[in-house]
């Protein structure tokens, strides 16, 4: 049975690629959705007067920030996304990476309560699939001091590799990695790293390329697609030229 991991940015499902999910699920694929929610977290922190800062694209997470992150990720964003998928007819079940725990992490030095995934436990997801549900996973992991904030792209890549997924789909707000306003059709992990280190890929694209490269090195092809385009997800899974595909060198022959 085909396994697909889909990473989405936040809670909106209307009018975009996630509207393809009912067909994917009814076609027999085992789908796991991993979500972010950085914008929602920033808005909530601002409203509470909690300062925030970033280092190399990762949010520095102190105890107060983690408390709010759990509230936003495992609470509002996770449940809104699950409800949106339920409205489409997808039997979604919202969980956190700390449940099970699905994601075990080690602390990232200098970033407080930010974790790097070191182990994935798939039993909870297997149980949900066995019951006919689609897991929706919030980007939190369990570490030596309890819960940790985890970059959602990295979490999705680690989950895809652990599950032996057929593909990792990273949804964003552009049509892939763009060069001269056109998506680069295919990259190797080494090429991803060069785009990131050279600064050509910056902002939110850099962590997606790093995550895609990590998945590809683990044997899972990854594709960066526009989550705002209806049909993009189905087209990617059908083998169409959609977005930017990242695979190991030698896999493009």
UniProtKB/Swiss-Prot annotation:
Which residues are recorded as binding substrate? 37-38, 59, 149
> Per its UniProt record, what SUPFAM superfamilies does this chain match?
Carbamate kinase-like (SSF53633)
The reaction(s) catalysed by this protein are: N-acetyl-L-glutamate + ATP = N-acetyl-L-glutamyl 5-phosphate + ADP
Tell me yes or no: is Lipoprotein among this UniProt entry's keywords: no
Q: What is its main location?
A: cytoplasm
> Which EC number(s) does the record attach to this protein?
2.7.2.8
Where in this chain does the entry annotate a coiled-coil region? Answer: none
Highest taxon listed in the record's lineage = Bacteria
Q: Where in the cell is it found?
A: Cytoplasm
Concerning InterPro entries, the annotation shows:
AceGlu_kinase-like_sf, AcgluKinase_fam, ArgB, Asp/Glu/Uridylate_kinase
**Keyword Protease recorded:** no
Which keywords describe this protein according to UniProt? Amino-acid biosynthesis, Arginine biosynthesis, ATP-binding, Cytoplasm, Kinase, Nucleotide-binding, Transferase
Q: Which residues does the UniProt site feature Transition state stabilizer point to?
A: 7, 208
A Gene Ontology annotation in the biological process aspect, one of them, is: arginine biosynthetic process via ornithine
Gene3D superfamilies in the cross-refs: Acetylglutamate kinase-like
Return the CDD domains for the record. Answer: AAK_NAGK-like
**Which family does the record claim for this protein?**
Belongs to the acetylglutamate kinase family. ArgB subfamily.
Q: Which NCBIfam families match?
A: argB
Role this protein plays: Catalyzes the ATP-dependent phosphorylation of N-acetyl-L-glutamate.
Which PANTHER family does UniProt cross-reference here? N-ACETYLGLUTAMATE SYNTHASE, N-ACETYLGLUTAMATE SYNTHASE, MITOCHONDRIAL
Return the protein name.
Acetylglutamate kinase
- From which source organism is this entry? Rubrobacter xylanophilus (strain DSM 9941 / JCM 11954 / NBRC 16129 / PRD-1)
């Amino acid at each position: 049975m085909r396994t697909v991991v889909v990473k989405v940015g936040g809670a909106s499902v209307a009018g975009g690629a996630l509207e393809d999910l009912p067909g994917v699920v009814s076609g027999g694929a085992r789908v796991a959705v991993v979500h972010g929610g950085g914008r929602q977290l920033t808005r909530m922190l601002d409203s509470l007067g909690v300062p925030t800062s970033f280092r190399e694209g990762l949010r520095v997470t102190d105890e107060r920030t983690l408390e709010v992150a759990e509230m936003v990720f495992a609470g509002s964003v996770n449940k809104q996304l699950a409800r949106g998928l339920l409205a489409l007819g997808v039997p979604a079940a919202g969980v956190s990476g700390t449940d099970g725990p699905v994601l075990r992490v080690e602390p990232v030095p200098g970033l407080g309560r930010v974790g790097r995934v070191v182990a994935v436990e798939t039993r909870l997801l297997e149980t949900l699939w066995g019951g006919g549900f689609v897991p929706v996973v919030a980007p939190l992991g369990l570490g030596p001091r309890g819960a940790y904030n985890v970059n959602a792209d990295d979490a999705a890549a680690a989950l895809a590799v652990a599950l032996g997924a057929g593909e990792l789909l990273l949804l964003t707000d552009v049509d892939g990695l763009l060069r001269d306003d056109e998506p680069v059709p295919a990259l190797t992990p080494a090429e991803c790293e060069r785009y990131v280190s050279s600064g050509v890929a910056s902002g939110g694209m850099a962590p997606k390329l790093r995550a895609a490269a990590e998945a590809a090195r683990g044997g899972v092809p990854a594709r960066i697609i526009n989550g705002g385009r209806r049909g993009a997800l189905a087209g990617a899974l059908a083998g169409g030229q959609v977005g930017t595909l990242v695979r190991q060198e030698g896999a493009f022959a």
